[in-house]
Amino acid sequence: MDLLSPLSAIVLTYREVDTDTLGKIGEEMRKCLEQMGRGTPIYVLHTCGRVEAYLYGASPEEVQTVAETYRKYVNSVRIIAGVEAARHLFRVAAGLDSMLIGETDVLGQLEEAFDRQVRAGYTRGLLKTIVERAVRVGKRVRTETAISRGPRGLGSLSIIYVSRLLDMRQAKVAVLGAGAVGAGLAMELAARGVKKLYILNRTLEKAKEVAAKTGGEARPLTKEEVERCLRECDVVFSSVHSMEYIIDKIPEGASVKVVVDLGVPQTVASGLPVKVVRIEDLREIAEQYNAERASEIAKAEAIVEEELAILPKLLARRYIEETVSTFIETAMLAAEEEGARAGCNTATLAARTTVKRILLPLVERLKKMAEDGQIEEAVKLAQMLSQTIGRKI
């Protein structure tokens, strides 16, 4: 039984469309998540460079329904399945599919989305195991190779870009947004010794957390505070997610000289009387660092393939755990019923103990079979046991 075959991925990246289109599709996918609820397990990754949806056990019709969400804005999307879908996710986590090869921001964004969607009940079961493993792959690649040495992501590249325009040590800087990208920006700006640092976020507590780590000042992300930052600061970085412009005008007499827009879709209006830096402006710098990191790509790809080879065994073990937990629960209920019939707590305890003694060694044996490569046999036996005891998974 191939436990990767039920995995599907709908993929669209910065290579195919502009960041504004990605932002609009990302918002549509947020609504799609809510509509799907807790039906088919799903995981959506939306960053400044991609919108990807991973489904497990979805019917062809469900996959096409999700793909149609993309097709509202683009003519075609890439749909991949099975081991190729897992390979793609692992490569994304490793930073191998990014504009800046080896970037670390994407791993933080992947983890943020994963934690949020697991809590909401969207990402679960074997899909949860696959995404968890992708996170591990991303961390392992960055630990065992030098692919992430230097700029950590597009935020880092934007700081390099701006530092070529003015002296950052003499600059007052504001960061709008305290998520993975915004927090990374703040940490790096603090390390560069900017004159003054402000962190704005819709949730003020989150801004305070980042400010405490960077020596910055936390402010709420409101229209008034954004305007205040434009008046006081030399540079403003926007890393927030918004379907409306966060900055649509520059107040008269403002000090701001450069505005950096890392939002998807764009959060800074065009035609402003200051220098506006967008994601597309960072490609040339990214290519320079990609050339430096090229020698590490093969090492990272080897780790991805090594982890892919392990994945089927991990999924089999997890599948067996989920399956047997259900039939053990059924057996325990039967034991309690027999104990209740006997009218004795001791009899109930004895029955439960007997169930454990009989079934737990079987469970461990099935797990060992999966680890030894007898995946199909172990899965079939687990299914047979489940069906025999009366609960089919």
UniProtKB/Swiss-Prot annotation:
Q: Which PROSITE patterns match?
A: GLUTR
Q: What class of enzyme is it?
A: oxidoreductase
Keyword line: NADP, Oxidoreductase, Porphyrin biosynthesis
- Site (Important for activity) at 88
Task: Quote the Gene3D superfamilies the UniProt record gives.
Answer: Glutamyl-tRNA reductase, N-terminal domain, NAD(P)-binding Rossmann-like Domain
Q: Pathway, according to UniProt? A: Porphyrin-containing compound metabolism; protoporphyrin-IX biosynthesis; 5-aminolevulinate from L-glutamyl-tRNA(Glu): step 1/2
The EC number(s) given in the record are: 1.2.1.70
Protein's UniProt keywords contain Repeat: no
Q: Which residues bind substrate?
A: 47-50, 98, 103-105, 109
Q: What catalytic activity is recorded?
A: (S)-4-amino-5-oxopentanoate + tRNA(Glu) + NADP(+) = L-glutamyl-tRNA(Glu) + NADPH + H(+)
A GO MF annotation of the entry reads: glutamyl-tRNA reductase activity
Q: Which residues form the active site?
A: 48 (nucleophile)
Assembly with partners or alone:
Homodimer.
The note filed under miscellaneous reads:
During catalysis, the active site Cys acts as a nucleophile attacking the alpha-carbonyl group of tRNA-bound glutamate with the formation of a thioester intermediate between enzyme and glutamate, and the concomitant release of tRNA(Glu). The thioester intermediate is finally reduced by direct hydride transfer from NADPH, to form the product GSA.
Recorded family membership: Belongs to the glutamyl-tRNA reductase family.
Among PANTHER family, the record links this protein to: GLUTAMYL-TRNA REDUCTASE
Domain remarks in the entry?
A: Possesses an unusual extended V-shaped dimeric structure with each monomer consisting of three distinct domains arranged along a curved 'spinal' alpha-helix. The N-terminal catalytic domain specifically recognizes the glutamate moiety of the substrate. The second domain is the NADPH-binding domain, and the third C-terminal domain is responsible for dimerization.
Q: Write down what this protein is called.
A: Glutamyl-tRNA reductase
Q: Its gene?
A: hemA
